[in-house]
Amino acid sequence: MEILDYIKANCGGKLFAIGGVSFGGQIAMELLSIDRDIADKAIIDGSLCIPQPRLAKISIFLVSLFGKLMFSKFSCKLQLSMMNKLYPKLAYPEEIKAYYLEDLPKTPIKTLVTIYKTYMGRYKLKDTISASKAQVLYIYGEKELNCVKASAKLFQQIHPNTILYEAKGYNHGYLSAYLPQEWIDLVVPFLKSDSLVMCNESDIS
């Protein structure tokens, strides 16, 4: 993996912490599975590690059929406009809006299909995750799909040094994407805790 090669070449082969949301969380899981010493801490948010082929097929069908419309520049502008009106406190900064309008419409449908195939349809947690030395904070929203909640529980079963945190009232990735201060208040105590000692959800909330 290019990420692992980069860490070995530029970071002495180890990081203090790694993390990711959704598909990014799968990448973090994979790194932990490949190298038990890659990080002291890991934060995973709303990630699947149990394949969902049916959900993948539905998502791929919709993206293949409507992707060009859903991710056109006009649609992206409309989405940002609606966010400004409906959720003004959650609106993106101007710099992020510019990237959103520039990058998303250029994303090939083939790339989106590949992401859905990997994220939903194929990725399965490896047993080697049990050897990882990292302490993990696994966040998921209360309103997540059941398969995401099941993935979190499976991860904890295989890698016991894991804290599960259910973000009450929130959907997929909502806490990290839209409530940065609340996310920081949750994560900082976890990062400051002793990585060699198990702690409970109550210790970081």
Where are these regions (language model features)?
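Short beta-strand immediately N-terminal to the catalytic nucleophile in serine-hydrolase-like folds
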Residues: 18-20, 45
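Flexible "cap/lid" loop of the alpha/beta hydrolase fold
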Residues: 33, 41-70
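Catalytic histidine-centered segment of alpha/beta-hydrolase-like enzymes
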Residues: 170-181
